[in-house]
Design a protein with these regions (language model features):
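Extracellular beta-sheet/turn segments enriched in Thr/Pro/Gly and aliphatic residues
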Residues: 79-102
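Short, surface-exposed beta-strand/beta-hairpin micro-motifs centered on an aromatic residue
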Residues: 43-46, 50-57
Length: 202
């Protein structure tokens, strides 16, 4: 079976970068590497790529969409797989803005992985890189008896996921619920506690 192989680069630096990838086959289905990790949540389905990917493809036209954070326009292309050889794609992502150079750094401080997440370490390693986030925080959350996968991380900096360009930490979400028995009455909302040394119990 022929393959589609791609490598994703920042067009300015030439660096191989992680991104979200969607490949639509001729029959309209989504195809991905056999060991791919899929995005969770609403919206279009994507799989996560560490900058390189290879997947089995059928003959015909395939639509490819690659996204990375908010500072890169989506990259799109339709290619034809004729079955005679593998298709190799060089994906160059053009950065439309360099906000960190202006002192603005993207981040997400409100992330939970629910009890259905089977590989939180792998997902957390992807999340900050694929979305090009300088700062990422998962939060401990007590909600009913749900075993949130991200509750396993201790408060503070998560060194195994942090590097020079990505700060990843675990904090805590505290909720003001008017009626704990009614999840739809959330009172004044949520407060995210960051840079804490210990979990704060109600």
């Amino acid at each position: 079976m022929p393959k589609i192989t791609g490598e994703i680069h920042d067009a300015m630096t030439g660096e191989v970068v992680q991104a979200r990838v969607q490949v639509i086959s001729p029959d309209g289905g989504n195809v991905a590497p056999t060991d791919a990790m899929w995005k969770v949540g609403p919206g279009e389905p994507f799989f996560y790529s560490n900058g390189q990917f290879s997947l089995d493809a059928s003959r015909g036209y395939h639509r490819i969409l690659v996204e990375r954070g908010t500072e890169y326009p989506p990259w799109q292309k339709t290619i034809e797989v004729d079955g005679s050889s593998d298709s190799v794609i060089d994906i160059q992502l053009d950065r439309w803005a360099d906000l960190p150079d202006r002192g603005w750094h993207p981040g997400n401080t409100h992330i939970h992985y629910d009890e259905k997440e089977k590989d939180p370490d792998r997902r957390l390693a992807y999340d900050s890189r694929v979305e090009d986030l300088r700062m990422t925080a998962v939060s401990i959350l007590k909600r009913w008896d749900l075993d949130y996968a991200t509750n396993k991380y201790p408060p503070g900096v998560l060194n195994e996921f942090t590097d020079t360009h990505h700060h990843v930490q675990s904090g805590e979400e505290t909720r003001h619920n008017q009626d704990p028995s009614n999840p739809f009455q959330i009172g004044y909302g949520h407060v995210m506690l960051l840079n804490i040394r210990n979990q704060v119990d109600p």
